Amino acid sequence: SRLLPYLEADGILSGNPSLGELGRLREVAALIQTRIAHLTEAGALVAPFFAPDDMVDVADDARAQLGEDAVRVLDAASTALQALPDEHSGVLASESTWTAPAIEAALRAAVIDGLGLKPKVAFTPLRTAVSGRRISPPLFESMEILGKTATLTRLDALRSTL
């Protein structure tokens, strides 16, 4: 809740965020708390989680570091993530099979083992697609928070610009 005034001032959230936005913010705040020294720094890391999935603003430095394998990585990642189940169970369907460990395992198999790439090369296009930034909260946890549909939309959106 201490973040809200800063996010409102940055135009990321309104003064009256929905319960869904507050829930997502709680998850994102847990990811970024060790990556910022001051609350004023939170906006850049939080903003991508509230951007329209097909309109993530890709920073110039993030786009510049996309290597020649970016298209192959995005295609392989999309295929692997589409095959990953996204089923919900438990009280209020609060338990999901779309989890950071499952996402990480699928992506490592597809882009590191499958394409024979080093993690930095393999995950840079994915981080750029998900956050639009070179530096972001942890990738797999970010994908879990965003959900399967949003993650795939973001991968496709970046892919369509390459």
What is each stretch, according to the model?
Residues 2-114:
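Small-residue-rich helix-loop
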Residues 98-157, 161-162:
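Charged substrate- and nucleic-acid-binding regions of tRNA-handling and nucleotidyl-transfer enzymes
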